[in-house]
Each structure stands twice: as C-alpha cells, then as structure tokens.
Amino acid sequence: MSMNMIEPMEEHYAIGIRNSFGITIDPVTGNMWDTENGPKHGDEINLVLPKFNSGWKKIMGPANEKEQLSINIPGFQYSDPEFSWDIPVAPTAISFVESELFPELKNSILVGDFNTGNLYEFKLNEERIGFVFEDPLFDDLIANQGEPVNEIIFATGFSGITDIEVGPDGM
C-alpha cells in the first residue's frame, strides 16, 4: 500500500473537524451536531450537514472572508460554527432531551463543558439549524471573554462533564 495514496473525498461525510468529544443526532430532523475543542480559542458547536467542512486546521471559531477562501475544497462547504467560545471551555458533551418530563427542553440542545463544569442550554430556532438568543451580546454567536453567559447556563457545579445521558425514566 502506497503511503502517498489519496482517499476519495466523496466517501467523507464531513471534513476539517478537530478534537470533537461530543456528537449527537437531532431526533426531529436527523441532523448531526458536534462540539469541537481547540488549544487556545474558538471552541465550537457545529451543525454537521453532509459535505460539511469545519475548516480545521486553518480556522478555529468563525472565519473571516480571507480564511474561508483558503479552505475551499471541492465538494465540501465551509460553515461557521453555530456558537463558539472565545476562550476554551472544552465542550465535551452534547445531547437532545426527549423526555416527556421536560417538555421545555424539547427544542434545545444541552452541552456540557470540561473546564468549568457548566451545563449549557441552547434554544433551537424554528428550523432547528441554529440557536436563538435574547441577549444581544450573543448576536455574534460568540461567548467573548468577560461577557456574562447567564442566558445559556442551565446548571453549574459539576466536575469535568464528559457525557450527558437521559435515563430510561426520563431523568
């Protein structure tokens, strides 16, 4: 087997994904979502549609126009994250809650982080392809350093969240 062999790109669902600890499937749309972790900035939540290009290794977090041009790979479409953190929180877990006990969470994604032990709730837009926020600080879809994140905090005080599971009883 040649070490110079190039894999056929049409066999890949998505490319450019970096250090993803969390992957989940939307039970309503069947769309894939993931979390990505970076070394210095730009931790992400992504909607991973077929032929998605997350941009790694050239882009962490949202891209400017010049960066987007630098990752043009035929057959794949770069997309900015649906949300990102300026400083790393290490989003490691992502899940939809389908329990009848929590109807208020049916249109949300829960994300846990390893660095601070926070559990976040992201409310989905009507099409379930992005998030809606009340706080204008999130209009840029970034939690910038020093900005309050109260709107998205669901629970705190955990130690290094690595997974989110809903038990058979819905809890």
Task: Give each language-model segment a name.
Residues M1-I153, S159-I161, D169:
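Beta-propeller domain segments
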